[in-house]
Amino acid sequence: MLLKTPQTKIALALGGGAARGWSHIGVLRALDEDGIEIGMIAGTSIGALVGGCYLAGKLDELEDFARSLTMRRMVGFLDFVIGGGGLLGGMRLSKRMREHLSDIQIEDLDRPFTAVATEISTGHEVWIHSGSLSTAIHASYALPGIFQPVDCNGRTLVDGALVNPVPVS
């Protein structure tokens, strides 16, 4: 008789890194295929996007979106703004994300999730582990100078990779 030992859950820290971050999708798929249970995810920037979509059950949709990106489609998401702390408003991307994540709240996910962002006024690291999933993700990837900062829970936040590129703490 073979005794099965209890499965150990792992915690994942998914880092930033722009386009390289899409590789997190493959990592999550490989862990699932090998039966490795993910107990929680912390993500920064694109790592927050991929991790949040995974826990929300939207990884297939995110992968389809990533695979469909062409230069023309990417340009279509650019919403240039004058003033406000970034070249891009980021609202077209944010709207697309909200369409797929609807009103999902972080605390309603079946496992803990934390998105890491940076408070622009202090430079401090901020862990977002409650509230709107799409807002938390948007704040975590709002690269200063490119995207406008995001108001979240009374704070003005930008990309978490500025203070914690891979949130292992």
Give the positions of each predicted feature.
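Patatin-like phospholipase
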Residues: 1-44, 52-169
